[in-house]
């Protein structure tokens, strides 16, 4: 398996920017839970790990193993999140930008950021290059996607112990048939995004019939 390229990182390293940071998020499309972002700064002389890919292309076991290896390889890693309340208040796009900004703040100072996706005019970033499909083309962004995915999945697994009805240890908050069936049966928890589930809101009796596990 050929390792992902460092061509984007090298373009800035060659300009004298040593702290180039890859940024990615996970959880934008979920019905429950926060959106989480990771920022990863790699050493200029780093050798890409061959297995690193977009986190969606890896198994949970592969991600867990690479998570530890990336932490060992990186100069700095920052995690940022935006809560369900923030998502409902400002919308998922702006909440995602908040999560990314918080992740970047935890690896400051940094010289230039490579961010997965396409940024809108409301993005609160400077010194940034947005790369569509960045987690498939940039090694540092792919590393960030793995870190963010593992951190969020572990958080949702902990929440699943409190709300076992929703299968969050398996679906991590995405709208799978299992999750939607549980919503029909038990209603919303405090961890569900009301702005994503407006059709379930009219009946107050339908709000959180699930009893948290002790």
Curated annotation (Swiss-Prot):
It catalyses: Endonucleolytic cleavage to 5'-phosphomonoester. Its main location: cytoplasm. The keyword Hydrolase applies. Gene3D superfamilies: Ribonuclease H-like superfamily/Ribonuclease H. Its EC number is 3.1.26.4. Residues 18-208 form the RNase H type-2 domain. Its cofactor is Mn(2+); Mg(2+). PROSITE patterns: RNASE_H_2. It holds the Pfam family RNase_HII. One of its GO terms (molecular function) is RNA binding. PANTHER family: RIBONUCLEASE H2 SUBUNIT A, RIBONUCLEASE HII. This is Ribonuclease HII. It comes from Thermosynechococcus vestitus (strain NIES-2133 / IAM M-273 / BP-1).
């Amino acid at each position: 398996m050929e390792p992902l390229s460092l061509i984007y990182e090298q373009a800035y390293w060659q300009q004298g920017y040593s702290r180039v940071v890859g940024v990615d998020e996970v959880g934008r499309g979920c019905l429950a839970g926060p959106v989480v972002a990771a920022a990863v700064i790699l050493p200029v002389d780093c050798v890409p790990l061959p297995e690193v890919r977009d986190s969606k292309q890896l198994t949970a076991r592969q991600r867990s193993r690479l998570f530890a290896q990336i932490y060992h390889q990186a100069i700095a890693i920052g995690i940022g999140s935006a809560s369900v309340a923030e998502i409902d208040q400002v919308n998922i796009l702006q909440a995602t930008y908040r999560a990314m900004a918080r992740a970047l703040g935890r690896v400051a100072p940094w010289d230039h950021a490579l961010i997965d996706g396409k940024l809108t005019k409301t993005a609160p970033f400077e010194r940034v290059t947005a790369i569509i499909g960045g987690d498939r083309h940039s090694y540092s962004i792919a590393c960030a996607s793995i870190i963010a995915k593992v951190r969020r999945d572990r958080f949702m697994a902990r929440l699943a112990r409190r709300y076992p009805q929703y299968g969050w240890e398996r679906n991590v908050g995405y709208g799978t048939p299992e999750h939607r069936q549980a919503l029909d049966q038990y209603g919303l928890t405090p961890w569900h995004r009301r702005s994503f589930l407006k059709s379930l809101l009219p009946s107050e009796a339908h709000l959180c019939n699930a009893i948290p596990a002790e």
